[in-house]
Amino acid sequence: MKRLTLLPGLLFLMQAAFSQESGSCKPVNLVCDYLVNPLGIDNPAPRLSWMLNDARKGARQTACQVIVDKDSLELIAGKGTIWDSGKKDSEQILITYSGQELRPFTKYYWRVNVWDKDGVKSSSAINSFETGMMGMEYWQGAWISDNKDINYRPAPYFRKVFDARKKIWSARAYIAVAGLYELYINGEKIGNHRLDPVYTPV
């Protein structure tokens, strides 16, 4: 008997959740410079865009707001200390970043709020983008070489031995090569990419 009582309750909750979702204008598919959560961007004013998930007749966005922060928890609280575009009465789904100067080698989190045709606000999931070097003045690397001619045919191995000064929680390796590379740490290949780096126009 309890099972028969709970089942209609569950169906009611599922139906209510579906109705709420189908009746909202939610920003989805967020991209930064047309990339999803990109790494190593060097654009000081990246383009932030999104799509709308709203199947209702006459659905449209009437206003939008983009917030950016280095702490994702700030976005959950509705704050953007790095940039807050403010609420803009606009149907556009692309905004160019115009907040604080982006720092090199930094991960930023961003979120979009939109208002639908009825003035109801809806928020996107939190996405991110990570800056690269952002300028040669930040270059601190030194070339690793085997001191052989560039036409030497066998693929060389470059090895750098170092001791971590503290426990590593997250790290990023920035690599520039004249050709292709694979990165190994303690004998284990890092990542599942092939033929890195990708084609770079001159």
Model segments located where?
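Beta-strand-rich ligand-recognition modules
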Residues: L94-E101, I185-V202
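Aromatic-lined ligand-binding clefts that engage carbohydrates, nucleic acids, or primary amines
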Residues: R165, W169-G187
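Short, conserved beta-strand segments of beta-strand-rich sandwich/propeller modules, principally
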Residues: R47, K107-R111, S170-R172
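Pro/Thr/Ser/Gly-rich low-complexity, intrinsically disordered linker/stalk tracts
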Residues: E21-K57, S128-G135
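Bacterial Sec-dependent N-terminal signal peptides
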Residues: M1-C25
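Recognizes extended acidic, P/S/T-rich segments that occur
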Residues: L52, G58-K107, N113, K117-S124, ...
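Low-complexity, Pro/Ser/Thr- and charge-rich linker/hinge segments at domain boundaries
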Residues: E130-R153
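Short edge beta-strand/loop segments characteristic of extracellular beta-sandwich folds
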Residues: R47-A55, V161-D163, R172-A176
